[in-house]
From Swiss-Prot:
UniProt keyword Transmembrane, yes or no: yes
Annotated region described as Disordered, given as residue ranges: 83-111, 160-203, 245-305
Localization of this protein: Membrane
Name the UniProt record assigns to this protein: Transmembrane protein 271
Superkingdom in the source lineage: Eukaryota
Primary subcellular site in the record, as a coarse category: membrane
Length: 385
């Protein structure tokens, strides 16, 4: 079996993570048993088993991921030039083809293999992520429990100091002794501290040893949980990279196999172009010619629309040039019956200082120029439209 660089890195990180998960599960089980023994008086501690659950979840997730990648992976990507196997790439039978024989139907029945592989891969990723999250939570909880156990140990297991004792005092004298005290009184008070220590050790020695072991186990559990978080995320990235590279190799192999099948066996080496591709290319050419730029119907610069609005046709000009002209006045004109009508322009009253017939305003206000439909004909000076 040939391993790539990505596959080797993913396998190495997965093996390290599996060893770390199993070690964390063992340490978590030991911490759970010690915490259950220390639950009563005088410590009143709880059993922290975060490493145990995270180790089990990570081991189960790695097993599912390995089964999905190793056992079901080679069926998804057939080799280039080989016959299509019972997976992806099985061509559909044409319309006029005869029915398949029982042997061929048995070969085609292996199509649900990739589906089950994908389901197994998704299940493995889900369990794996649950293990990583539980490892993160276990690292936080175990770190807090370590500080709590340290306080419990210093309170219950360490012997109490004498009220007047200090670390810098002389071994033959006590700081609280009077200046005139006898020198023989100091040796008589010294054996009192060993008697108190021996009395404390005989009462709680077993519990204190268990508490110290529990603290060491919690420290190891915190370290293993942190390693599980880091190695878990690294392994997930490496497995994802390996899976994507494997899918790319499979697609490249199927593409080379398709080119090899499309090339004629005894020809000159040129690829035979199927009629479907020629028809598709012809449709692309026609679509490109059809999508050439056409002049817009609302374009003012279109040369074909110069004769759309004849002189006097205000309705036709307004239909094609709705926004090309702004008339700031009202043009009054007479129709054939002699009635006064409004032909185009703004429906407000005539603005002060504006005369539609004043040619000097056309240069200053080009938007006030009359459209061609409102320009009177030379022989019809009495009509505005």
């Amino acid at each position: 079996m040939k391993w790539s660089v990505r596959g080797a890195c993913a396998a190495l990180s997965s093996c390290l993570l599996l060893a770390c998960a199993l070690s964390a599960a063992a340490v978590g089980l030991k911490c759970f048993s010690l915490g259950s023994e220390l639950r009563g008086e005088p410590f009143r501690l709880g059993a922290a088993a975060g490493a145990f659950y995270s180790g089990l979840l990570l081991a189960a997730g790695l097993s599912l991921l390995g089964a999905a990648l190793l056992c079901c992976g080679p069926r998804d990507a057939p080799l280039a030039g080989s016959e299509p196997g019972p997976g992806l790439g099985v061509p559909a039978a044409p319309a006029g083809a005869p029915e398949a024989t029982p042997g061929e139907s048995g070969a085609a029945a292996g199509a649900p293999g990739p589906v089950s592989s994908q389901n197994l891969l998704l299940l493995g990723v889900l369990v794996f992520m649950l293990g990583v999250l539980s490892a993160f939570a276990g690292a936080v909880i175990d770190g807090d429990t370590v500080s709590l156990v340290e306080r419990k140990y210093s309170h219950y297991c360490l012997p109490p100091r004498a009220p007047g004792s200090s670390p810098g005092s002389a071994p033959g004298s006590t700081p609280g002794s009077a200046p005139g005290s006898a020198p023989g009184s100091a040796p008589g008070s010294a054996p009192g501290a060993p008697r108190a220590r021996s009395t404390l050790d005989s009462a709680t020695s077993a519990k204190c040893r268990q508490l110290k072991d529990y603290q060491r186990g919690l420290v190891l559990s915190t370290v293993f949980n942190s390693l599980e978080c880091l190695l878990g995320l690294l392994s997930l990235l490496l497995v994802k990279n390996y899976k994507s590279s494997q899918a790319r190799r499979g697609r490249r192999g199927r593409r080379r196999g398709g080119r090899a099948l499309a090339r004629p066996r005894g020809g000159s080496g040129l690829r035979a172009q199927p009629p479907a591709s020629r028809a598709r290319r012809g449709r692309r050419g026609r679509r490109g010619r059809r999508l050439q730029q056409r002049p817009s119907e609302a374009s003012i610069l279109s040369p074909e629309e110069s004769d759309l609005a004849a002189p006097g046709d205000c309705a036709g000009f307004a239909a094609h040039h709705a926004v090309s002209y702004i008339n700031v006045g009202v043009l009054h004109a007479l129709d054939e019956a002699g009635a006064e009508v409004r032909c185009g322009g703004h429906p407000s009253v005539e603005l002060p200082g504006y005369a539609p017939s004043d040619p000097d305003l056309n240069a200053s206000y080009p938007y006030c120029c009359r459209p061609p439909c409102e320009t009177p004909r030379p022989w019809e000076t009495h009509r505005a439209c």
